[in-house]
Every structure is written in C-alpha cells, then in structure tokens.
Amino acid sequence: MSIIRFAFLACATLFSIHAAEQHLNVFIWSEYLPQDVAQEFEKRFACKLVIDVYEDAESMLAKVQGGGAYDIVVPPDYMVAAMVKEKLLTPLRLTNIPNFKNLDPKFRNPPFDPENKYTIAYQWGTVGVYARRKEGETLDESWSLFFDPQNQPGPIVLINSMRDLVGAALKYRGQTLNSTDTKQLKEVRDLLVDAKKRSVGFASSVAGKNKVLEKSARAAIVYSGEAGRGMEQDKETYYFIPKEGSQIWVDNLVILAKAPHRDLAEKFINFVLEPEIGAKISNYTQFTTPNAAAKKLIDPELLKNEAIYPGEETLKKLEFLKDLGRDTKLYDQLWTSIKSR
C-alpha cells in the first residue's frame, strides 16, 4: 500500500512540476506588454511567458510563415485576412473568453474578421510625426517635412515599415493608403528614394522616437504610443497627424493554427480583457485601449492627450490599411527597389 501511495505521490509531483513549467510563447511588437502584467499572468496561471519581439509586421508574418513555434501573435488589421487565407490562425472559442463582453462594441465584428472568429483587438492608434520644438519656429504639420526638400526641418527618420511609409507618401500626394495604381506607386518610389538620401536612415518606431529624444533627429515617422511615451520624457517634443491625413490601425491578439498551448492562449486573451489589466497595458504603452471596461481606469492625462485619443475632426482624416491580396507584390517590389537604391 505504501508503495502504491509513493507511486501516486511521485506521479502527482511530476504532474505539478510539468504544470508549473508550462510555457506560453508570445510574438509581439517591442515595448508592447508591461513586465508587471507578464509577471502577474505567470503567477496566476503557474506558467512561463516566453516573449519574442518584432519591429515591423512584415517580418512577423515571414517568421510565422517560416514555422515559428508561437502561440499568440499580434498582427495589424490589414494582415489578418492574409493570415486566415494561409490557414495560419485557429478560431477563437469565445466561450473560453468571457471577458469578450468588455470589448468596446466598435471593435466587435470588424470588417477584416466578421464575428471575431480569429481576433480580439489589443490596442489601436495612428501613424504620425514625432518632432522636437525649436524656439521661434513652427513646423508645418505636413508630410512635406519628409517628402519636400524645401520643407525639411533638419535630420529626419523614415519608419522601417513598408505599408506605413508608403502609405505616408501616398497621403502626401493626396492618394489613398491602399493605392494599387502603378503610376502612383512609381511616383511614390521616386519620392521615397529621394527622402531616403536626405534622411538619417530607416528605423523602427521605437528607434525613431529615441533619435528625436537624443536630438540626432528633428522629426520621425512613428506610432502614436511611442510618441506619447517620448512626450512624457521630454516636454519639448510633440506629435501630430499631418494635415493630408494618415493611418488608423488596430493590432489584434490571434492564436496560431499550430499553437502548442491553445487553452493557455485563450486564458491569456481573457486575462488581457480584464479591466484592470487592459488599463495597465494602455497606461504603459500609451496606445488607445479598445477595452470599454478599462477606459475608466486610464490615466486622465492620457485621455486628454489628442495624440493618443484623437478627436472626431482628426479621426475624419484617418484611413485603415486593407489587405491588397495579389497586389501586395506591387508593394514588395516597390520596397525592394527603395531599399536597394
């Protein structure tokens, strides 16, 4: 009897160790998940959160297509349809995500994922310009700071993200972010090759923000949350949406089709949708929360900041990127041409 009991206890101990060593593999943008939130999830669910980061959506997709063994990734809205077509995602079991009820109705049933079959909105924001003030000089709030040599205010940084940068140049020329007109794209290529020669180089949104902070650049194309964190560090910096218009985006939590830990991944999504956790995330990232229940817990100073919570007039100037399907190859060719010249 004692041998049986010993064997049972040994098995129970091994099971306990195995459960404690369970891993959840998350592939996410850099500076997008607070450490205290990650630690709280690990403690509550007796697991290890393994976080890998990326700086642009295209590199994330390439790694996932190459067989990266992740559970959760965070693609932008326009990339979801392509991932579904390639059978890279597994459907969400919303019965396992009761906190879905906290999601703002504006982010339910999105056009890129009807009925939230595959996605839950994580954060949303804009693409714009982060710049340094200079006494006695007011910058023109225009994309011309980057694309017109006569209006360049000093050293500039171009965002190292194909759709974001090409979209900015298209907006400067008064065109849609989603143009597939070969003549327009050729003109944009020439514009960006010229801007590249005059810039301090390509950089991620985080790195671009840092160059403005360290004064090696006067202006950078960045995401709104990066600008919000930068403005907090240096009051002489600010963020604006150019008058020609720009991009609004939604990043989403998805579970990969080959996710090793699907159940734990759904627990993570449900955890993120808790009001307190959602607020912690957005107070840290300074991007806008899609969690209606979290909004009352957001720092009031952030809610007043139009760089993070844009007003109705600003929203009218913003456009979503769309999945271009086969025409994506036009952008791939364009990007290769820009980078190689």
Give a label for each model feature:
Residues 312-341:
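Conserved C-terminal helix/tail region of periplasmic/extracytoplasmic solute-binding proteins
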Residues 79-82, 213, 218-236:
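A ligand-binding cleft/hinge motif common to bilobed small-molecule-binding domains
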Residues 64, 74-216:
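Extracytoplasmic ligand-binding site segments that recognize negatively charged/polar headgroups
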Residues 84-92, 113-117, 229-241, 302-305:
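Ligand-binding "clamshell"
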Residues 128-135, 171-172, 250-264, 269, ...:
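A bilobed periplasmic-binding-protein/Venus flytrap-type ligand-binding module shared by bacterial periplasmic
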Residues 20-86:
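Early extracytoplasmic/lumenal segment of secretory-pathway proteins
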Residues 256-316:
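Mature extracytoplasmic/periplasmic domains
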Residues 102, 125, 185-195, 233-257, ...:
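Periplasmic-binding protein-like
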